[in-house]
C-alpha cells in the first residue's frame, strides 16, 4: 500500500484550528496531548493548524548556547520577539503572522520509520501545491536556520522545515511554512541572534552558519500574493482529495486534563532555561 492510501484514503482526520488566540507553549502542549490520544486509540488522526505572533522557538541545542541571554536580549529588546524552548527539534525557528504551522498526529510505534513519518507530511504539502508550476525538493539547506534532511525548498531556497516527536504510541509531525513576508529577513534575524549568542566562541555542537539568501517565502517563490488563510484552505482540500474524511470533534474533558500536564512541563522546561541565564 502506498503512503497516500495508508494515511489518507478513507482515514478519519480530526481538524483542530488554533490559528489564533494561543501562546506558543500551549501549542506544543496540545500536540503532545493529541499525540497521546491518537496513540491510545481514543482519537482519530489529528491535523492542527496554528499561528503565533513574533516568537522565536528555540531548540534543545539553542538552550546550551554560551551567551544565550545576550541572544534573547537581542530578540526581545531590539526586534520585539519572545523566545521559548520547544520539546521537538534541535534548533531555532521564527514564527509570526506570515508563518503557518501544521501538525499531523497519527498512531505509530517503532515500525513507522522517521523517514516514513516525514514523507507523510511531504506528500500532503506536495498535494497542496500540485497546481503550481514548481518542484518542491526535500534536502538539507545547510545555511538555513534549523537545517535538516527534510527541509522543503524551491530552486534551492528553503520555505519550510519539518520536525517530529513521538509520545506514548503517537507521532506528531510538525511543519512551519513560511508563506507571507520575507524568508531572508527572518533568516537575517536568526543569523544575528546566533552572532549575539555565540560571540565567535567555538562549541562542541556546530550551530548553523546562516546565509539569509538561501531562504524565501512561498509568496516570493510562487511570485504571487498568497496568505496563510489560502494555505489553510489548500490543506483541507488536499486531505479530502487524498481521500481523507475530515471532522471537527471538539477537545474532550480528558484531553483538557492531559493538556494541563503537558503545559506544566513546557512551563518547567522554559523556567529551567531562564534560571540558567541568571
From Swiss-Prot:
The keyword Acyltransferase applies. The active site is at residue 146. InterPro entries: aa-tRNA-synth_II/BPL/LPL, BPL_LPL_catalytic, LipL, Octanoyltrans_LipM/LipL. Pathway: Protein modification; protein lipoylation via endogenous pathway; protein N(6)-(lipoyl)lysine from octanoyl-[acyl-carrier-protein]. It holds the Pfam family LplA-B_cat. One of its GO terms (molecular function) is lipoyl(octanoyl) transferase activity. Residues 41-247 form the BPL/LPL catalytic domain. Its EC number is 2.3.1.204. The keyword Transferase applies. The reaction proceeds via a thioester-linked acyl-enzyme intermediate. Belongs to the octanoyltransferase LipL family. PANTHER family: OCTANOYL-[GCVH]:PROTEIN N-OCTANOYLTRANSFERASE (PTHR43679:SF2), OCTANOYLTRANSFERASE LIPM-RELATED (PTHR43679). This is Octanoyl-[GcvH]:protein N-octanoyltransferase.
Amino acid at each position: 500500500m502506498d503512503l497516500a492510501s495508508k494515511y489518507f484514503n478513507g482515514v478519519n482526520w480530526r481538524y483542530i484550528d488554533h490559528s489564533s488566540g494561543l501562546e506558543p507553549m500551549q501549542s506544543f502542549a496540545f500536540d503532545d496531548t493529541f499525540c497521546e490520544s491518537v496513540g491510545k486509540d481514543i482519537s482519530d488522526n489529528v491535523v492542527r493548524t496554528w499561528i503565533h505572533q513574533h516568537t522565536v522557538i528555540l531548540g534543545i541545542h539553542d538552550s546550551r548556547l554560551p551567551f544565550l541571554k545576550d541572544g534573547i536580549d537581542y530578540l526581545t529588546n531590539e526586534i520585539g520577539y519572545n523566545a521559548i524552548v520547544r520539546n521537538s527539534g534541535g534548533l531555532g525557528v521564527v514564527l509570526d503572522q506570515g508563518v503557518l504551522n501544521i501538525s499531523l498526529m497519527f498512531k505509530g510505534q517503532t515500525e513507522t520509520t522517521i523517514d516514513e513519518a516525514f514523507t507523510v507530511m511531504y506528500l500532503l504539502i506536495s498535494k497542496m501545491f500540485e497546481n503550481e508550476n514548481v518542484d518542491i525538493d526535500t534536502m538539507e539547506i545547510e545555511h538555513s536556520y534549523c537545517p535538516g534532511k527534510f527541509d522543503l525548498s524551491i530552486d534551492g531556497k528553503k520555505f519550510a522545515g519539518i520536525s517530529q516527536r513521538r509520545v506514548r504510541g503517537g507521532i506528531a509531525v510538525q511543519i512551519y511554512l513560511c508563506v507571507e513576508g520575507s524568508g531572508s529577513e527572518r533568516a537575517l534575524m536568526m543569523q544575528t541572534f546566533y552572532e549575539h549568542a555565540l560571540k565567535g566562541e567555538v562549541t562542541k555542537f556546530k550551530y548553523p552558519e546562516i546565509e539569509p539568501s538561501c531562504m524565501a517565502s512561498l509568496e516570493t517563490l510562487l511570485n504571487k500574493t498568497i496568505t496563510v488563510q489560502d494555505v489553510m484552505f489548500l490543506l483541507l482540500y488536499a486531505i479530502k482529495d487524498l481521500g481523507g474524511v475530515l471532522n471537527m470533534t471538539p477537545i474532550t474533558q480528558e484531553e483538557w486534563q492531559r493538556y494541563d500536564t503537558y503545559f506544566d512541563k513546557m512551563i518547567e522546561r522554559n523556567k529551567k532555561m531562564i534560571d540558567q541565564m541568571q
